[in-house]
Swiss-Prot record:
Residues 615-618 are annotated as: G3. One of the essential components for the initiation of protein synthesis. Protects formylmethionyl-tRNA from spontaneous hydrolysis and promotes its binding to the 30S ribosomal subunits. Also involved in the hydrolysis of GTP during the formation of the 70S ribosomal complex. This is Translation initiation factor IF-2. Residues 178-187, 230-252, 259-273, 291-300, 359-368 have a biased composition (Basic and acidic residues). Transmembrane segments: none annotated. Residues 590-594 are annotated as: G2. Residues 556-733 form the tr-type G domain.
């Protein structure tokens, strides 16, 4: 004590009490203290001494009882919980109950549906076993009543005989209480839980014995008895003490989850079973809808409830447990004895209720077996209460399902099915014919249903398999196919194709593409005929520009003329001559040549008509459109030099024009030269199907001179005459569609595309889609460099506003909204990415980066002297490993390297390979100007080595370790900053800032960078073998004599192709 202050722990020692006892006394006396080390005044200590002397010295002297008492005064919740725990310990009657039940129906009591009790529903659990649950204010009275009644009064004797006359009296004891019994507290009796269904063979024995099977209907009389008990004891209780929660629990009976399934038959038999206790049921009707709760466990092993499955009610003669719980608050009015016990004597009501789909397939039950049990007797009645029937459907429990049911209990409830989806009723004849025998039991039903289900399932699988594996009569091979696509076409497994190719020495996987010869080899083994269609030219027009909706608004449009021909035959000179003669008069500065299409006004029959020329030669657009170039044109002009004759490029142009089915006008140029021989040119053209008109054919041939400007008007007049015959029309009122002539990325204006409108009218602000690119037209510029607001059919304009650069030759179309355009471009981009991944020239595996678009590619253009050399080189290229670099063969053919090949290589960044061939005139200059790599070979091995080296050059170099030398630690010196190793260079050399490893007894103790290297106190860059040096590291000082320092460096090395 100091200055009249006393500490709590000193006072506890003085009084021989614990600190918590003193704190409890302080709390009772309202003395403010915080802990056992708090100080109080001497007067307060004296008061505590006086109070503590009157209290017993025991650990019970604490603040907890006082605190609980005060809490009980405020609310009865805590006291009720303590009371519930004490009552739940009364378990003496249970062995007697179990013994009596096992004596009468030991085989029936194995599959009780229970769920584990929890603390949140202890009130309901007490009610389930018939133990009264008093209020908090009736603790002493309830204990007293329980002691008076005794333990045996809580048990209902199961072997007491049951007859129909006294069933109601026995089961509804609380209803029959006399006036003399009202003075006493009614003690509800413990009711035996319901038993599982029994086989029909036991039904007769159970009827004869008359065993009383209590069910859940006994709860309602007990509940009423509870209410009366509360009324009788109301003068002794305080209304404020009873909590809302307890009142709710005492007034509302909650059925168990299991009863929801087991009471199905009771619900269905409600109309058929009428009892004379209607007034009793009206008294027992609960005020609120009952909520599900949980049964109390028996001491036996609990049998968990199965999850409802897709099933129908049991057969007519099968037994069931009737718990007698009416969710609507009604009681049966006729035969109570049969309702309370097993419903054995009356046949069950035949119902057709919608089945409940289940989330798991633990037990297979045949649909047909279920439908045999369905009848049409009650389908109309159940239509009004379909939801009730769905909830109360009963599923029998099988004895071998104990372990599986535990897993099913915690799963979510199944989704109910609408009654409109249920199958209609079967005819009575069909139902009676398939009626099960009374002697059939659950095991037979399960066995039969399983067999039926397996047979139906196997039959359906066979039908599906036969439908999927239907062989094809003839296979059309148009291009390479993957193994998966070929297997689907042949209706055989993919593994079979992989196995067959593996036996032939070809290793493939399911995603690899097979070339046509390999596909033919596989198909021939199947005995299926093969059809290889002729290769369709890409120049053929596959899409119609005009549609049916355009026929009502067609107008004439200018012709689109494409100039084609061999290199240096005067195509560009002819176009320049036409521009100079017809445009210079109207436009003082001439025509801008920055786009590939332009229009010329031509006078024909006294009227000015417009002709649109497409300047394809020398353009990147023409290179991208080479195979499709003829599709955009209406009239093709073939330029042939009179002094050179027909050349390979001329023949190619003729084939494009025929594939596109466009009229062809031949312009024989350079007739002003001395070496010109137009007749020889006509003769050569006849060999390719072009017969001049003067020789009796239909081919129009006009001799012209671009330099002398001879017969240019005749050529233009012929173009207009041919266009009139073709009757070229379009609908300018519709949304525009056409073709991309060329496209490029401008530094100032962004993506720029030259569009040729073939139908409709293109306007500023339109949403256009070109291939996999879309955008909004911000501005349009015509061939003269002027801005225009709209472009009519056969008009070529430059368009600004696209989000990306489209591919030359792509078709464009205008859409009404941007959302639709974005969806289409996304779909096309995905398809384009997939086609690029699947486009392969070898059988190498597709790497992961190929699927993600990160695969490196090497583009090749192959030209050879003969076709046999080309085939040999292509076969050799397929053998190169292509897991990391994909080899793309863009073009292969026999002949010389032309300027067109140079343009294609420049556009696609390809390498041109020439094998025993030459370069055409002008091709080498074009290659130098475009920066195209042209390789020429005459030995195939050298060619393959160089291609493999080029593929390896695309790979990222790998880092390898290169050793520098070894150093031995011979002395260790300690300095202020740490330790320095005195070393001797054994071999090689050691370099400052190189990577090192320190080994001690063969184990690595440190890895890092050599920070400091000195020789004779001088910093040096390197020390060679045979010299001493000092070595130190910033973060390593644990040196030991004899350590070996390995110095090395990382260098890059060219990677090899992995097989």
């Amino acid at each position: 004590m100091n200055n009249g202050k006393v500490r709590i722990y000193e006072l506890s020692k003085e009084l021989n009490l614990e600190n918590k006892d003193i704190l409890a006394v302080c709390q009772r006396l309202n003395i403010s203290v915080k802990s056992h080390s708090s100080t109080i005044t001497e007067s307060e200590a004296e008061l505590i001494r006086t109070t503590a002397e009157n209290l017993p010295h025991s650990p019970s002297l604490s603040a907890a009882p006082e605190k609980s008492n005060s809490q009980n005064q405020d609310s009865g919740i805590g006291y009720n919980e303590q009371k519930k725990q004490q009552i739940l310990e009364v378990r003496k009657p249970k062995p007697l109950l179990e013994k009596s039940q096992q004596k009468n129906h030991s085989k029936i009591n194995n599959n009780l549906v229970t769920t584990p009790p929890n603390t949140s529903v202890l009130n309901n659990q007490v009610e389930r076993v018939g133990i009264s649950r008093p209020n908090s204010s009736l603790k002493s009275e309830t204990l007293k009543d329980n002691s008076e009644v005794g333990d045996n009064s809580l048990v209902q004797h199961p072997n007491r005989p049951l007859n129909k006359d006294n069933t109601v009296k026995e089961n509804y004891v609380p209803q029959k209480t006399d006036s003399n019994e009202k003075s006493k507290v009614e003690v509800p009796k413990l009711v035996a839980p319901p038993a599982r269904p029994a086989p029909p063979s036991l039904n007769r024995n159970l009827r004869n014995t008359g065993v009383n099977k209590p069910n859940q209907k006994n709860k309602k009389p007990k509940q009423e008895g509870k209410k009366r008990k509360d009324k009788e004891e109301k003068p002794f209780e305080k209304p404020a003490i009873v909590s809302k929660k307890e009142n709710k629990d005492t007034s509302i009976e909650k059925p168990t989850i299991a009863s929801k399934k087991e009471n199905k038959d009771t619900f269905q038999n409600r109309e058929s079973v009428k009892t004379s206790a209607s007034d009793t049921s009206s008294q027992l009707k609960p005020k609120h809808r009952e909520k599900p709760t949980v049964k109390l466990k028996q001491e036996q092993k609990p049998q968990l409830a199965p999850k409802p499955k897709l099933t129908t009610p049991l057969k007519e003669e099968s037994t069931d447990v009737n718990l007698g719980l009416d969710l609507e608050g009604k009681e049966p009015e006729d035969n109570v004895a049969e309702t309370v016990s097993y419903d054995l004597e009356k046949p069950r009501r035949k119902t057709i209720a919608p089945s409940k789909p289940t989330l798991t397939k633990d037990k297979k039950v045949s649909k047909w077996e279920e439908e045999e049990e369905d009848t049409s007797e009650v389908i109309q009645k159940n239509a009004k209460s379909s939801a009730k029937n769905k909830r109360l459907r009963l599923k029998p429990l099988l004895e071998d399902e104990d372990e599986e049911l535990a897993e099913l209990l915690n799963k979510p409830a199944p989704v109910t099915m609408s009654l409109s989806l249920a199958r209609p009723a079967k005819p009575k004849s069909f139902t009676e014919k398939n009626k099960p025998q009374p002697g059939s039991n659950i095991s037979n039903l399960k066995k039969k249903s399983s067999q039926s289900h397996e047979s139906v399932q196997s039959e359906s699988n066979e039908q599906t398999q036969s439908a999927e594996l239907k062989p094809v009569e003839k296979l059309v091979i148009s291009a390479s196919m993957t193994v998966q696509e070929l297997a689907l076409a042949l209706a055989i497994p993919e593994t079979e194709i992989i196995r067959r190719l593996f036996m032939k020495g070809i290793a493939v996987n399911i995603t690899e593409s097979l070339d046509i010869p390999t596909i033919e080899m596989v198909v021939k083994e199947e005995g299926i005929p093969i059809e290889v269609p002729e290769e369709q030219s890409a120049a053929k027009k596959t899409t119609e520009i005009l549609e049916e909706t355009d026929l009502a608004s067609l107008q004439r449009r200018p012709p689109v003329v494409t100039i084609m021909g061999h290199v240096d035959h005067g195509k560009t000179s002819l176009l320049d001559s036409i521009r100079a003669t017809k445009v210079a008069a109207g436009e003082a500065g001439g025509i801008t040549q920055h786009i590939g299409a332009y229009h010329v006004d031509v006078e024909h029959e006294g009227q000015m008509q417009q002709v649109v020329f497409l300047d394809t030669p020398g353009h990147e657009a023409f290179t991208a459109m080479r195979a499709r170039g003829a599709r955009v044109t209406d009239v093709a002009v073939l330029v042939v030099a009179a002094d050179d004759g027909v050349q390979p490029q001329t023949i190619e142009a003729i084939s494009h024009a025929k594939a596109a089915e466009v009229p062809l006008i031949v312009a024989i140029n350079k007739i002003d030269k001395e070496e010109a021989n137009p007749d020889r040119v006509k003769q050569e053209l006849m060999e390719h199907g072009l017969v001049p008109e003067e020789w009796g054919g239909d081919a129009i041939m006009v001799p012209v001179s671009a330099i002398q400007k001879q017969n240019l008007d005749t050529l233009l007049e012929m173009i207009l005459l041919v266009s009139e015959v073709e009757d070229l029309q379009a609908n300018p009122e519709r949304l525009a569609k056409g073709t991309v002539i060329e496209a490029n990325l401008d530094k100032a204006r962004g993506p720029v595309a030259t569009l040729l409108v073939q139908n409709g009218t293109l306007k500023v602000g339109d949403i256009i889609v070109a291939g996999s690119v879309y955008g909004k037209v911000r501005a349009m510029i015509d061939d003269r460099g002027y801005r225009v607001d709209k472009a009519s059919p056969s008009f070529a304009v430059e368009v600004l506003g696209l989000r990306d650069v489209p591919q030359a030759g792509d078709e464009f179309k205008v859409f009404k909204n941007e959302k639709e355009a974005s969806a289409i471009t996304t779909e096309r981009a995905d398809a384009k990415r997939e086609s690029r991944i699947m486009r392969r020239t070898s059988l190498g595996a597709v790497s992961v980066r190929a699927q993600e678009g990160e695969l490196k590619e090497l583009n090749l253009i192959l030209k050879g002297d003969v076709q046999g050399s080309i085939e040999a080189i292509v076969a050799a290229l397929r053998q190169l490993p292509q897991k990391e670099v994909q080899l793309r063969l863009l073009l292969s053919g026999a002949g010389e390297v032309t300027e067109t090949d140079i343009d294609l290589a420049a556009a696609s960044e390809a390498v041109i390979i020439g094998f025993n061939t030459t370069m055409a005139s002008g091709a080498r200059q074009a290659a130098d100007a475009a920066g195209v790599d042209v390789r020429e070979y005459n030995v195939i091995y050298k060619l393959l080595d160089d291609i493999q080296g080029a593929m390896e050059g695309l790979l990222d170099p790998e880092l390898i370790e290169e050793p520098l030398g070894q150093v031995e630690v011979r002395a260790v010196f300690t300095i202020n900053r740490g330790a320095v190793a005195g070393c001797y260079v054994l071999s090689g050399k050691v370099v400052r800032n190189c990577k090192v490893r320190v080994r001690r007894n063969g184990e690595i103790v440190y890895q890092g960078i050599l920070d400091s290297l000195r020789r004779m106190k001088d910093d040096v860059k390197e020390v060679n073998a045979g010299y001493e040096c000092g070595v130190s590291f910033d973060n390593f000082n644990n040196w030991s004599e004899g350590d070996i320092i390995e110095a090395y460096q990382m260098v890059t090395k060219r990677r090899k192709l992995s097989t």
